[in-house]
Amino acid sequence: MKKKSDGQCAFLNLRLLIALLVFLSGVALAMFADARPRSGKPSSNVAQKQTVTAGVQPPNQAFWAQTNGPQGGDGIALATSPSGHIFVGTQGGGVFRSTDNGETWTGINNGLADTNVRALVINNAGHIFAGTWSSGVFRSTDNGDSWTAVNNGLDSLSVRSLVINSSGDIFAGTFYGGVYRSVDNGDNWTLLNTGAAGPYVPALAINASGDVFAATWDVKFCTGIFRSTDNGDSWTEINNGLTNLGILSFAINENGDVFAGADVDGLCGNGRVFRSTNNGDSWELVQSGLSTGNGINALLATSGGAIFAGSYGDGVFRSTDNGDNWTPVNTGLTEQRVISFTVNQNGDIFAGTYVGGGVFRSSDNGNTWVERNNGLVATDVRAIAIKSDNTIFAGTYGTGMDRSSDTGQSWEQINNGLFAHFIRSLASAPNGHIFAGADFVDGLGGVFRSTDNGQSWTDVNQGVIEFDVRALAINSNGHIFAGTYVGGTIGGVWRSTDDGESWTHVNNGDNCGLIWSLAIDSQGHIFAGTAGCGDGVYRSTDNGDTWQLANTGLTSTNVAALAVSNNGHIFAGTRSLIGKGGGIFRSSDDGETWTEEDNGLTALDVNALSINSVGHIFAGTDGGAFQSKNDGANWLDVSSGLIPPRGPIDALAIDSEGFAFAGTAGGGVFRSVQPTVRSTPAPRPRPTPRPRPTPPL
């Protein structure tokens, strides 16, 4: 064989080196391609196997995030700052701020330990003071961005009213603790009850001279109005002419005339609005044109001379002749339980409403009103149902039904035909129909059905079940069971086998009638949880025809929630009664016996239970959310991200992707940041590098 020359060898070595580099580059490219973030689109030639695992929460990440609704809330207190910003204190949702005249709202609760806000007042420096249900007074010196408790000397921490005089002295009216004063911007408080009668002070007012007016109540009777002319050091009763001592609100006009709004429960007298033109020495009834059915929770005197009265159920009334005559001004006011007012420098009037109605604004002296709740998420959500396509239905207590088709990013109110707005239960049927159970309020209640994804609703109460419907459950055959909360044999469980068209009372064996929860297992056995009668749980194995008590070991019998896991175990969430009981119980034998499973459960008043596809149990309590990954044996607090962190949860549901949704008392709906069950692709096999031809030698 002919020996190759040195040049030929060099050329051969170069070609071999090139071939090797090409081969290695192919391997490297294949490895790099496998290491890049995957787009989620499956390869055309590789089968994508899915494995279901428990969701893992990244460290230091909150478990929950608030969704964008449902919007609204109880506008308990309103105030306007010197800069024109509007603040609203809500029941359960804390404080919200609007910097654009109510067009949008932002929650500002950093440091606000109690989000049940009953009073707001702002001084000339822009410092904001919030009176809370059970945690006293909080102060913000940075426009609400942060809050600090200022309760030194304030022995009664349930604050219902706040006012500030021209010197900056702050007065706080408390719930059965009397009146307190702070002369140092809230740093310290002094009790001021000399001469005052009733210790419950729902309203305070200060005139231009610094005289303080206090509405007072006692345990057994109403005590009317007291006045202090020495900055609160002493008080004098001024009830001459008051035919109703149950005062709830005040307003003082530019002339110094004092207006007082009263309750109308009949226990404290008669009359709704009173006027004094002599600083409270005497009062006269001024209610011509006012409706007689509801009390006056709010009063407002504007710089233009108009007086506005907010009633609990009849909306807003306006007087342009100093109270002599009143006219209803409710155009656009869709919620007419009005409980607070404020007015800005431009004369725009804001009205806070109850039962979730939120805030309304009028820019034409009350002639028309527009709802302004964008970003105001402080609703009370008592029920959640999720359809198979992950459409979420949220039943609120006061504003009816909301729906979200994008995991809570946006919500729309869907109340067409839904005349009862105090929703307590929801269920989705196999045929896609949605059923809503409502409390009986204002003459409306019972069961409603939607056959078009919530676009419209129909009252389906044939068979007389217009009661408080606290629970709904639907079996695999589409039979619907409604648990009503009505004592005695008239209440209990009702069944419909025709999509709600008609109902049959199926209470054989159950004499309690106070049904709070329902669940159905894979065998079709029905479990009914009762409350208030000591019966605990009933079970039916024949589609509701007969019932038997199933309570062995169930030491707490107020059963607010029931859930069944994939392994057939039944869980009962209970609530305490007079400080006793509460907690979670498990049955692994179809309800025959129960075992208490509370290890790690630090809040024992349980309102809701939900179980994901891998058997992890979630419990909603008065003290936040808990999770068990071992069949209830141990519980972990998963309340982070809630507002407040351990606030009440009244409803729970989990969608098909494993995301948990929580209905809260004052914060709308929250969603778990991560799915509680995570579907992840199995590792893809690394592509085998395609052989490349060896260059010819």
Predicted regions and their residues:
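Ser/Thr-rich, Proline-interspersed low-complexity disordered segments
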Residues: 36-38, 43-59, 676-696
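Short coil-to-beta transitions that initiate beta-strands within beta-rich domains
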Residues: 68-79, 111-121, 153-163, 195-204, ...
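Blade-level signature of beta-propeller repeat domains, shared across WD40, Kelch, NHL, RCC1
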Residues: 69, 344, 350, 355-357, ...
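Residue-level detector of Asp-centered blade-edge/turn motifs that repeat once per structural unit
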Residues: 80-83, 122-125, 164-167, 206-209, ...
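Conserved beta-propeller blade signature
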Residues: 85-87, 96, 128-129, 138, ...
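A short loop-to-beta-strand structural motif that recurs across blades of beta-propeller domains
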Residues: 94-97, 135-139, 178-181, 223-227, ...
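Short loop/turn segments that connect beta-strands within beta-propeller blades
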Residues: 99-103, 141-145, 183-187, 229-233, ...
